[in-house]
Design a protein with these regions (language model features):
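Non-catalytic interaction-recognition regions
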Residues: 97-119, 233, 288-290, 295-296, ...
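N-terminal, positively charged nucleic-acid-binding surface of large information/translation enzymes
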Residues: 9-12, 18-104, 437-440, 444
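Alpha-helical recognition segments enriched in aromatics with Gly/Pro capping
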Residues: 1-33, 48, 98, 119-327
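Short, glycine/charge-rich beta-strand/loop segments that flank catalytic centers
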Residues: 67-71, 93-96, 106-121, 139-148
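Short, polar/flexible loop-turn hinges at active-site or ligand-entry regions and domain interfaces
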Residues: 81-87, 108, 301-305
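Structural preference for alpha-helix termini/caps and helix-kink/transition segments
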Residues: 268-447
Length: 447
């Protein structure tokens, strides 16, 4: 049985979906005002790998990941560029789809955009106001944190802890609140900002309400898994829980999953440190599948350290797997040994999607394959395991000239013309084709 580390309970829990053999997942997507950075890619790859493993286990996965296209940052960048917020968002949504495609990330079941859910957002906020969980102040609408049961339970904090942290705030927005911890559900429009009409005047939604509405509209009041980066645990996911459960009276998500950060040369990635790297730029020099493999091979909850050596190692390891995959089939295979690898892989991945251990199994299996155990059954199993990591190797077809040279070399060897055979081997090596003579015939790999 798959076990998931649930942030809410701080424990490993057996995964039991609401509907048998169906997984409903909502993963917070990017705010689309710039190209995604390697930290965004870590989250996208981690949850894509989790989705793929559920599918490997024959679950049907409804995978929802949103685009935040209404946000303070988007408004600021669009104004600076002299374009509309929609033009800016459209540009970076396209860039996101292109970049993540190179990382082998499957398209989501749906990618909802905030601008398409404005009526539903206004209705959601209105319900919270009617139920006394929210109040209007000078055109803004705020959520009453004090009325929420166990607010910040996800972040393992108490209301008292948060109030101490919030003490001393004197900004204009705080003056409009009943409590410094109250957060905006709806923001009154400022001059020149994009806005929508509402019962409280023109404005736009707050960040937290957007995800609650899109998740519940598509997947229902209670979902199986809600995921995102560890930085979203508080306040974003905390506030999602508070407002969603206040509206519905039901548990918002049964499992909360958060991926770890990406460090660059052992320092947390940040713009202030100047080690901020966009995926768009990285893909100009690093193959997308290599970057994907690097990100996928560390267990999703742990931090991962981005270095040139780590990328080089990922490239070398991926090449070994590719060469293994391209080996010609043999008649040799031990079913019991194959089953041992399949069970070891499942054991690793069932343990909170431990991809680090899963990759170890992959390489153990590759070593076994290289010893001659590679019939079609083994190849199919190997490919299915690779696909969990988003790795798909295209069947490489040698051109006719190279095929002809290999045949000529085989004929020369049969005639004991070893000088010709060696010459052809060297000629092929110069073209990047490495030959391996085995009892089952000649195998080749491309350097």
């Amino acid at each position: 049985m798959i076990k998931i580390y649930d942030t809410m309970t701080r424990s490993l829990r057996d995964f039991v979906p609401l509907t048998e053999n169906v997984v409903n997942m909502y993963v917070c997507g990017p705010t689309v005002y710039n190209y995604i950075h390697i930290g965004n890619a870590r989250s996208a790859v981690a949850f894509d790998t989790i989705r793929r493993y559920f599918e490997y286990c024959d679950y049907t996965v409804n995978y929802i990941s949103n685009f935040t296209d209404v946000d303070d940052k988007i408004i600021k960048v669009a104004n600076e560029a002299g374009i509309s917020t929609k033009e800016l968002s459209d540009k970076f949504i396209v860039a996101f789809m292109e970049d993540t495609a190179q990382l082998g990330i499957k398209p989501a079941t749906q990618n909802p955009r905030v601008i398409n859910y404005m009526d539903e957002i206004i209705a959601f906020v209105s319900t919270l106001v009617d139920k006394g969980f929210a109040y209007v102040s000078e055109g803004d609408v705020y959520f009453r944190v004090a009325k929420s049961n166990n607010y910040a339970k996800l972040a393992n904090k108490t209301l008292e802890d948060l109030e101490i942290g919030a003490s001393g705030r004197t900004d204009a927005e705080t003056e409009r609140k009943e409590n410094p911890l109250d957060f905006a559900l709806w923001k009154a429009a400022k001059e020149g900002e994009v806005s929508w009409d509402s019962p409280w005047g023109p404005g736009r939604p707050g960040w937290h309400i957007e995800c609650s509405v899109m998740a519940t509209e598509i997947l229902g009041d209670t979902i199986d898994i809600h995921g995102g980066g560890a930085d979203l645990e508080f306040p974003h996911h905390t506030n999602e829980i508070a407002q969603s459960e206040a509206k519905t009276g039901k548990t918002f998500a049964n499992y909360w999953m958060h991926n770890g950060f990406v460090n660059v040369d052992n320092e947390k990635m940040s713009k202030s440190l100047g080690n901020f790297v966009t995926v768009h730029d990285m893909l100009k020099t690093v193959d997308g599948q290599v970057l994907r493999f690097f990100l996928a091979t560390q267990q999703y909850r742990k931090p991962i350290n981005f270095t040139e050596k780590a990328i080089h190692d990922a490239e070398v390891n991926l090449k070994y797997l590719k060469n293994t995959h391209s080996l010609p089939l043999t008649d040799q295979m031990n079913q019991d040994e194959l089953q041992t690898y399949l069970e070891a892989f499942q054991e690793a991945m069932d343990d909170d999607f431990n991809t680090a251990n899963g990759v170890t199994v992959l390489f153990d299996m590759a070593k076994w394959i290289n010893s001659g155990n590679y019939d079609q059954t083994v190849k199919d199993a190997f490919e299915k395991m690779l696909q969990v990591f988003g790795i798909v190797f295209e069947e490489e077809v040698l051109d006719e000239d190279i095929e002809k040279l290999i045949e000529e070399r085989q004929a020369a060897r049969a005639n004991k013309d070893f000088a010709t055979a060696d010459r052809i081997r060297d000629e092929l090596a110069a073209q990047g084709i490495k030959l391996l003579d085995t009892k089952d015939g000649v195998r080749w790999t491309r350097d």
